[in-house]
Amino acid sequence: MSLKIRLTRGGAKKRPYYRIVVADSRSPRDGRFIDKVGVYDPMKPKDDPARVSLEAEKIQAWLAKGAQPTDRVLRFLDAAGLAKRPARNNPKKAEPGAKAKERAAARAEKAGAGEDAAA
């Protein structure tokens, strides 16, 4: 049985409220779960301590048993210091694309030719 620590949605239309639960990965999002380990209320302000409420002992026990947190829950656990989220590093993201490199080279060449003519 593959266990996940994930969010289940509750609340009214356009007023979401999430429970953080441990569930079998094959069960539906809002279906049967094994244990409730916290809550997340996105309608509260970001600096409100009650926005995310976690039961640390239960979560650590489930992580020790092999439960895998989803990406969003892993963010909450990392913020609470219960789990470490690996750093994402994409050095090529800031690098300009091929066309931008061509334009920059053409601009530099044109500027170099203009300086030679002025000298």
UniProtKB/Swiss-Prot annotation:
Region of interest called Disordered, as start-end residue ranges on this chain: 81-119
Ranges of biased composition (kind: Basic and acidic residues): 92-113
Keywords assigned: Ribonucleoprotein, Ribosomal protein
Record carries keyword Transmembrane: no
PROSITE patterns: RIBOSOMAL_S16 (PS00732)
The keyword Ribonucleoprotein belongs to this UniProt entry's keyword annotation: yes
Domain of life, per lineage: Bacteria
Matching PANTHER family: 30S RIBOSOMAL PROTEIN S16 (PTHR12919), SMALL RIBOSOMAL SUBUNIT PROTEIN BS16M (PTHR12919:SF20)
Family recorded in the similarity comment: Belongs to the bacterial ribosomal protein bS16 family.
Stated name of the protein: Small ribosomal subunit protein bS16
Species per Swiss-Prot/TrEMBL record: Methylobacterium nodulans (strain LMG 21967 / CNCM I-2342 / ORS 2060)
